[in-house]
Amino acid sequence: MIKLAIDGMGGDNAPKEIVEGSILALKQFDDIELTIFGDVDKMKPYLIEHPRLKVVHTPKYFEMGVKDIGRHTLRDDKDTSMLMAINHVKEGLADGVVSSGPTQALIFASFFMIRPMKEMKRVAIAPMVPTVIGKPTILLDAGGNIDAKAEHLLDFAIFSTIALKEVYGVKSPKVGLINIGTEPGKGRDIDKETFELLSKHPLIDFYGNLEPKEILTSDAQILLSDGFTANIVMKTMEGTASALGKILKREIKASFWGKLAAVLFLKKPLKRFKQSMSADEVGGALIAGLDKVVVKAHGSSEAYAFMNAIRQAKTMVSHDVIGKVKNVLRGQDE
């Protein structure tokens, strides 16, 4: 049985969507046990009796806009729903943690409580992103390391390759190195050095350099760069998707015929378009480099999306993704 700790109060839609997503997961997967940490009074309207569900009460939780995160957090906020869930994993009472709470707090607390795996030199944020090809695609590092080295990016590529193989069944995910041109000699020193490392590694199916204009349409399912570049890419993708949606709505509403066409012919295609650009189907961001499984669900996750974040976590545990990453990294260090 896979045991997961859930931050019941993290996220814009907590606790309702978090609790309901957890219950969906219990109904969908018969090999998990969940412990939800949060304010029982606020969660009560959405809770059910279930033999594989435990609830631990705490009235404290992190607001989504929290900024003051530091060493004092581990001492002063240890009874928040997020830190109690992380501590459950630290104490060996759960195999992984899922939270929609503030990213900075989750990464900081996980780093110092669960600890990084010794084999990886940095921790990275690895969100799943929607693309035109409609296949599971990871972007990393989405903001964790703006001063990364080539060896760190290689570690991130290895982690993502194993995660896509084990969690999503991708046989040979291609790694694309985000760069200003496709030629091997393009980019900064870190890009050139990373290109060489990726080209030579036996586990990596290297796509080559990937120009930003190709990100949504290429066959690469791992979009790799340092935290500064990848974070800009992620936010540009979010902004572009939002802008396209607004433009489409504006044009449809501009005339009677546009509205009629939307009702008669475009309803299903628009629904499919929205689903293809949504991360709800694939879950949350993986936190690469920690000694246990940590999944950061989107802050605005609704029940279905949170259920899929739980599915991510439970599959990572059942397929021993962390152990397999460690074995590969140990092998290359010997």
UniProtKB/Swiss-Prot annotation:
It comes from the Bacteria. One of its GO terms (cellular component) is cytoplasm. Pathway: Lipid metabolism; phospholipid metabolism. It holds the Pfam family FA_synthesis. It is an enzyme of class 2 (transferase). It catalyses: a fatty acyl-[ACP] + phosphate = an acyl phosphate + holo-[ACP]. It is found in: Cytoplasm. Keywords: Cytoplasm, Lipid biosynthesis, Lipid metabolism, Phospholipid biosynthesis, Phospholipid metabolism, Transferase. Its EC number is 2.3.1.274. GO terms for molecular function: phosphate:acyl-[acyl carrier protein] acyltransferase activity. GO terms for biological process: fatty acid biosynthetic process; phospholipid biosynthetic process. Catalyzes the reversible formation of acyl-phosphate (acyl-PO(4)) from acyl-[acyl-carrier-protein] (acyl-ACP). This enzyme utilizes acyl-ACP as fatty acyl donor, but not acyl-CoA. Belongs to the PlsX family. PANTHER family: FATTY ACID/PHOSPHOLIPID SYNTHESIS PROTEIN PLSX, PHOSPHATE ACYLTRANSFERASE. Homodimer. Probably interacts with PlsY. This is Phosphate acyltransferase.
